Amino acid sequence: MDYEFLRDVTGQVIVRMSMGHEAIGHWFNEEVKGQLTVLTDVEDGARSVAGSERQWRRVGHEYTLLLDEEEVMVQANQLSFTTDELEEGMSYYDEESLSLCGLDDFLTLVEKYREFILH
């Protein structure tokens, strides 16, 4: 999972993720937006599920983050889409709507994001 942190002209931090992990970048860009308390909540959530089979969820405006002791899933809060509505020969692209990664990798990303924000 590769990522890059950038600042736009307004100073807002932008996260760019490698292919297959785009939804994680969108989660940072849309739900975190530099608010370190969101990251603290997620880290607390990760600690709360450690050593258990429980899951922890944070529903945001655009994306929902779901984690367990091993994995993180970020999914867009879009309305369900039925393929019956598509015209023949068309397909629905949702690669940027759902991403999975290991919990340890995600927590490392959270730590690096926080460091980038603070420096």
Curated annotation (Swiss-Prot):
A single Pfam family, by name? UPF0231
Q: Can you tell me where the transmembrane regions are?
A: none
- Please give the family membership noted in the entry: Belongs to the UPF0231 family.
- What's the protein here called? UPF0231 protein ECA3777
Species: Pectobacterium atrosepticum (strain SCRI 1043 / ATCC BAA-672)
